[in-house]
């Protein structure tokens, strides 16, 4: 006997019970240890930060990380999965700053770095219990007891070792360059961090500013040879910018050497801009008084909008960093560059070397002047009228100043894409300063080549989003002017400037006259700031630089750092024992510019090869309407709410099957509820049906029931089952859970809507003959195989099926479905011809039901005929061989198979068409057909009454009735049919005994009273 199955199963409650079974029996640990002799399969876990609560997007990534290793374990692989925690960086610091009410780095300095970092350390696991609970609840099997933690000393030391390898190859340098800078956080950001913070539709100023040309410079240029100022009117160059705050630092104007420029007569002055831009700027009505190429403008000089020296700001030469004397006249040049565009602006580019990457490069190339009037907090410095204001606030003041001086040509607003800090949401500024860089551009070709060795799912990511990122790779600005992070392991001599990179603690301790290390090692600021030693070159004091590492460097170093490579002896075999490279990683698509990149870059820089082989790249989660989830829209769904209502299996199944992994997917409680109804409940109803009838008949599973001559319906479902095993195996082996899951959905649909429905009478009949036992065994085989196929996807319901159907009847069976092997298809049982024939029958039946629906003819009403137009003559044989099934499904008396292209008569036929197929039902009804339809309706009503009266499925009953003349005739004529279908011993005309269940009904417009009694 099987355990009785509740048809109204509470899935969340069932899952909690199964979690206890797994925990009590240590099933996760056993699933790994039992496969220790198998080939290793390695998952790298992208480390989350536990100082924030897990969201539904974390559920998405975790269930996709889970499905493949579960499958691999069932295929015999040894697959220990180590968790990880990302514990450093701005995400952590900002949360602590909020708790302390801090608004700047100065607040941290006053509070004390040691105390601040202590708060950071204690905050990183603030919500770890919620993470652990969610991880267990969704059945993501990962070892969190031995998880790697990026703030651990051993992890940090491996990160130091990795940087030392790059240093020794000449790939680490300090440079004065323009980098993206967060004024709120007071630190540079890497290009992959910047890529995660862009916001579309950001409103900014759009100002067109006039720069007055020095008249005396005109004669020395090509323009002076082509055009002579016919009056005393001043000549201006018109430039455009969206960052007015950078204008006080302007030291050049850039033009395109090969494009045409026009001189316009603006009545009171002349103005130069690119000729292709006249139309867009609506300046075609102004007279053109001169034309030239951009190269003719080179050599012109113009008057500064502001003389910084008047406001207490120095002006320096970029060639030698010398300061310009306060009395020296100041003028700036027109230069030619390749980056001037004719798609926007004026064709004349405002150039401020301190605040633009290309501007800085031009400054170095042409030896421009250099002006820095903004501090690291993004505030205007000096004695400007707008000093002390944040740059974005100063935009209006600067624009107003220029307008008052007659230098503002237009002042508008525009919407464009602008970078914001990926963590604190402050607008970034581009800022020239010293930073430490990893020369990733030196290995660009190796990065691109290595990417070709990685299997990406979806495939277009390889040469698309990720490939493009690698093609346009720039050097990695990895240092951060912050506090809580891996200290940059570079020491500099305070006397001679000698710099050294240290690759480990023992190496550091071996330095001459090393001192400052505390008894309890903590490789963090401020302690690491105190570690000094003597310079080998001059004997001076070697002191560590103050920066910490980009937290993306931490997570990107995990392939080595999680094992404390190369310091632990057992870590040195990672390349030979299957721990490196990873077989599989999985995260959201934005990690192409985050963790996926940092992993790939560090591995390539150190080892010259990729560190992962297969990637599932997940699309984003949207709300029910397809909009991005955000707190401001109040459309964020908390995982607990959905898990408590529908269970983890429903959420998992929805994520696997709703859309291919790389696609964005909508998510809501309603959508998960639909999956529950359409798949899980369908499967559960099959399971419940089987157990109910198997228990009635005391069925004991045995393969002998499928030996010898097997009924065609059973042969078909077993053929479909074995084809399903092949397809699911192939899908998961190809890292495509969606394709595999959808095939399971199709099969469960076949099983429920065709096999079980068409086999019901086989289960209902009283005798346990070979046909009935074959049906039981076939359905049992399907359910047990499904439990194993579903184990990687829906581990709870798979376990429930296995515990009841297998373990309860076979005490020698393995104690969990998750310890069993993945099913292996018996190809000898696959009959493609039979599969195709029955699928054709199902298609014809479905189209026939559609035609009946169009004709408003309920299925219980028998019809005289159905005509089927096929797509090829070859299909006729199979259809006619299985014609009886079509007749039963559509409740018709005759089937006519027409040749392809045959026209169906219009009169008395209603048709449904799909491609080359047409199925048409004859709508004419004879008295005999009407009577039979009424009899079927009576059967339907009696079956409903049995349920309402709470009779058992196997209970026999007596039926009593009172009817008019028409229904009296129907019941007499079809009495045997009615008795058989409703398990009625007799049908009696007249009132039933007292206590009978009764209903008064209307059958096709005729009154009928029915009584049923056991």
UniProtKB/Swiss-Prot annotation:
Motif 'KMSKS' region is found at 628-632
Chief localization? cytoplasm
Record-annotated disulphide pairs: none
**What InterPro entries does this protein's entry cite?**
aa-tRNA-synth_Ia, Anticodon_Ile_ABEc, Ile-tRNA-ligase, Ile-tRNA-ligase_type2, M/V/L/I-tRNA-synth_anticd-bd, Rossmann-like_a/b/a_fold, tRNAsynth_Ia_anticodon-bd, Val/Leu/Ile-tRNA-synth_edit
- What keywords were assigned to this record? Aminoacyl-tRNA synthetase, ATP-binding, Cytoplasm, Ligase, Metal-binding, Nucleotide-binding, Protein biosynthesis, Zinc
Domain of life of the organism encoding this protein:
Bacteria
Q: Where does ATP bind?
A: 631
Q: Which GO terms describe its biological process?
A: isoleucyl-tRNA aminoacylation
A GO cellular-component term linked to this record: cytoplasm
Single Gene Ontology MF annotation: tRNA binding
Motif placement: 'HIGH' region: 48-58
The record comments on the domains as follows: IleRS has two distinct active sites: one for aminoacylation and one for editing. The misactivated valine is translocated from the active site to the editing site, which sterically excludes the correctly activated isoleucine. The single editing site contains two valyl binding pockets, one specific for each substrate (Val-AMP or Val-tRNA(Ile)).
UniProt record similarity statement: Belongs to the class-I aminoacyl-tRNA synthetase family. IleS type 2 subfamily.
Which NCBIfam families is this protein grouped with? ileS
**Protein name, please?**
Isoleucine--tRNA ligase
* Source organism per UniProt: Dehalococcoides mccartyi (strain CBDB1)
Q: Upper lineage ranks?
A: Bacteria, Bacillati, Chloroflexota, Dehalococcoidia, Dehalococcoidales
């Amino acid at each position: 006997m099987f355990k009785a199955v509740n048809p109204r199963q509470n899935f969340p409650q069932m899952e909690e019970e199964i979690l206890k079974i797994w925990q009590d029996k240590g099933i996760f640990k056993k699933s790994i240890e039992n496969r220790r002799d198998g080939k290793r399969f390695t998952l790298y876990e992208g480390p989350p930060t536990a100082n924030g609560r897990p969201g539904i997007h974390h559920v998405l990534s975790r269930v996709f990380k889970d499905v493949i290793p579960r499958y691999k374990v069932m295929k015999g692989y040894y697959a220990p999965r180590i968790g990880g925690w990302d514990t450093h960086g701005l995400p952590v610091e900002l949360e602590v700053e909020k708790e302390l009410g801090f608004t700047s780095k100065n607040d941290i300095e006053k509070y004390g770095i040691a105390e601040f970092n202590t708060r950071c350390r204690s905050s990183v696991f603030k919500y770890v219990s919620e993470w652990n609970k969610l991880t267990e609840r969704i059945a993501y099997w990962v070892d969190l007891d031995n998880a790697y933690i990026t703030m651990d000393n051993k992890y940090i030391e491996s990160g130091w070792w990795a940087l030392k390898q790059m240093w020794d190859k000449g790939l680490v340098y300090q440079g004065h360059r323009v980098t993206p800078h967060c004024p709120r956080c007071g630190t540079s950001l890497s290009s992959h961090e910047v890529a995660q913070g862009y916001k579309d539709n950001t409103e900014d100023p759009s100002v067109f500013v006039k720069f007055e040309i020095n008249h005396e410079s005109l004669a020395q240029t090509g323009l002076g040879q082509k055009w002579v100022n016919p009056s005393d009117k001043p000549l201006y160059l018109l430039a455009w910018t969206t960052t007015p705050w950078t204008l006080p630092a302007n030291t050049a104007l850039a033009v395109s050497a090969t494009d045409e420029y026009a001189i316009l007569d603006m009545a009171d002055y002349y103005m130069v801009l690119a000729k292709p831009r006249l139309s867009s700027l609506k300046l075609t009505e102004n007279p053109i008084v001169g034309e030239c190429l951009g190269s003719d403008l080179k050599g012109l000089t113009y008057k500064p909008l502001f003389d910084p020296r008047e406001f207490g700001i120095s002006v320096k030469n970029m060639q030698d960093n010398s300061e310009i004397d306060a009395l020296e006249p100041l003028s700036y040049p027109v230069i030619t560059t390749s980056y001037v565009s004719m798609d926007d602006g004026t064709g004349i580019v405002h150039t401020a070397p301190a605040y633009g990457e290309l501007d800085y490069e031009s400054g170095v190339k042409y030896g421009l002047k250099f002006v820095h009037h903004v501090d690291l907090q993004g505030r205007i410095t000096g004695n400007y009228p707008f000093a002390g204001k944040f740059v974005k606030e100063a935009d209006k003041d600067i624009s107003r100043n220029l307008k008052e001086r007659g230098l503002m040509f237009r002042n508008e607003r525009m919407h464009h894409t602008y970078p914001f800090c990926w963590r604190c949401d402050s607008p970034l500024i581009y800022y020239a300063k010293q930073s430490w860089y990893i020369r990733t551009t030196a290995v660009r070709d190796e990065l691109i080549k290595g990417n070709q060795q990685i299997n990406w799912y979806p495939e277009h990511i390889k040469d698309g989003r990720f490939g493009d990122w690698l093609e346009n790779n720039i050097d990695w600005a990895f240092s951060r002017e912050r506090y809580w992070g891996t200290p940059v392991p570079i020491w500099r001599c305070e006397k001679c400037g000698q710099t050294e990179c240290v690759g480990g603690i023992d190496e550091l301790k071996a330095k001459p006259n090393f001192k400052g290390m505390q008894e309890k090692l903590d490789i963090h600021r401020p302690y690491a700031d105190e570690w000094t030693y003597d310079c080998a070159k001059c004997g001076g004091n070697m002191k560590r630089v103050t920066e910490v590492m980009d937290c993306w460097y931490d997570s990107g170093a995990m392939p080595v750092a999680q094992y404390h490579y190369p310091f632990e002896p057992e870590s040195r075999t990672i390349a030979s024992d299957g721990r490196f490279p990873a077989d599989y990683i999985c995260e959201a698509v934005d990690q192409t510019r985050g963790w996926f990149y940092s992993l790939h870059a560090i591995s390539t820089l150190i080892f010259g090869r990729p560190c992962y082989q297969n990637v599932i790249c997940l699309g984003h989660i949207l709300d029910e309407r397809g909009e991005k989830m955000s707190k401001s829209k109040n459309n964020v769904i908390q995982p607990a709410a959905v898990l408590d209502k529908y269970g983890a299996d429903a959420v998992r199944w929805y994520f696997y099957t709703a859309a291919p992994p790389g696609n964005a997917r909508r998510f809501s409680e309603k959508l998960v509820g639909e999956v529950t109804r359409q798949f899980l409940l369908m499967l559960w109803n099959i399971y419940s049906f089987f157990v109910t009838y198997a228990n009635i008949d005391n069925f004991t599973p045995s393969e002998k029931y499928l030996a010898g001559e097997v009924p065609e319906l059973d042969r078909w479902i077993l053929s479909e089952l074995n084809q399903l095993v092949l397809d699911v195996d192939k899908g998961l082996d190809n890292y495509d859970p969606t394709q595999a899951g959808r095939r399971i959905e199709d099969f469960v649909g076949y099983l429920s809507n065709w096999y079980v429905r068409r086999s019901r009478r086989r289960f209902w009949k009283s005798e346990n003959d070979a046909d009935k036992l074959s049906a039981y065994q076939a359905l049992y085989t399907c359910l047990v195989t499904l439990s194993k196929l579903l184990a990687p996807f829906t581990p709870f319901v798979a376990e429930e099926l296995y515990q009841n159907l297998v373990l309860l009847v076979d005490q020698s069976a393995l104690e969990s479905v998750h310890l069993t092997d993945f099913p292996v298809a018996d190809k000898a049982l696959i009959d493609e011809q039979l599969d195709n024939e029955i699928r054709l029958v199902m298609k014809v039946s479905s189209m026939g039901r559609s035609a009946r629906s169009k004709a408003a003819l309920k299925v219980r009403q028998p019809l005289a005929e159905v005509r089927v137009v096929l797509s090829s003559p070859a299909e006729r044989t199979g259809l006619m061989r299985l014609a009886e099934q079509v007749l039963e499904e559509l409740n018709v008396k005759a089937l006519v198979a027409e040749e392809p292209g045959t026209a169906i008569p219009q009169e008395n036929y209603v048709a449904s068409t799909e491609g080359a197929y047409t199925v048409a039902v004859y709508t004419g009804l004879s008295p005999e057909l009407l009577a039979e339809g009424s009899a079927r309706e009576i059967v339907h009503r009696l079956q409903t009454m049995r349920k309402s009266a709470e009779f058992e499925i196997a209970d026999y009953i007596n039926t009593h009735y009172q009817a008019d003349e028409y229904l009296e005739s129907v019941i007499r004529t079809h009495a045997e049919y009615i008795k058989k279908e409703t398990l009625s011993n007799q049908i009696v005309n007249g009132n039933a005994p007292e206590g009978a269940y009764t209903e008064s009904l209307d059958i096709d417009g005729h009154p009928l009273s029915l009584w049923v009694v056991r």
